[in-house]
């Protein structure tokens, strides 16, 4: 396997494992795929849910794991035990900014409100030109089909630019998704492409 263009990838995913075994397997598969490509992991910390599965797989594979977690969520009762390096932050805003700062790309596994919020924020940042990093959606068993249908409806109704729809890179398996991310070239029209953005501009 050729050398990856990425050193670290941020993975967004659920703090629960979901009801299907396929979600569990996909998290481990993604962790193993990162290891195979010599990519380190950035994630939201803890050892529960899909977050715990992907981080443990990367850690067991000998790659570096960075868990970024608000101090208020660091108790084992809430998040379990983070493997690898723990980077405490003050709040959720700092968590997202730090994860973005440390990463070369983003991938979302199945998850709930938190995962959706993190995913949509980095998509928005890409649209604005704040970053040029690929955003991948691991669409396990069609989990995100309804979200993609909604986004397509927003394009149809004129709320999302057609070129901005291309920000999202989607695939059903980790290997296929990683192959697509490796080849990704930004070609959408950024809203603020002439601005030199830094994380400080985000108010974090």
From Swiss-Prot:
Expressed in roots, leaves, stems, tiller buds, shoot apex, immature inflorescences and flowers. The keyword Glycoprotein does not apply. InterPro entries: LOG, LOG_fam. GO terms for cellular component: cytosol; nucleus. Substrate binds at residues 77, 95-96, 112-118, 124. GO terms for biological process: cytokinin biosynthetic process. Its EC number is 3.2.2.n1. Disulfide bonds: none annotated. It comes from the Eukaryota. It is an enzyme of class 3 (hydrolase). The keyword Hydrolase applies. GO terms for molecular function: cytokinin riboside 5'-monophosphate phosphoribohydrolase activity. It catalyses: N(6)-(dimethylallyl)adenosine 5'-phosphate + H2O = N(6)-dimethylallyladenine + D-ribose 5-phosphate; 9-ribosyl-trans-zeatin 5'-phosphate + H2O = trans-zeatin + D-ribose 5-phosphate. Keywords: Cytokinin biosynthesis, Hydrolase. Cytokinin-activating enzyme working in the direct activation pathway. Phosphoribohydrolase that converts inactive cytokinin nucleotides to the biologically active free-base forms. Belongs to the LOG family. This is Probable cytokinin riboside 5'-monophosphate phosphoribohydrolase LOGL10. The lineage of its organism: Eukaryota, Viridiplantae, Streptophyta, Embryophyta, Tracheophyta. The gene is LOGL10.
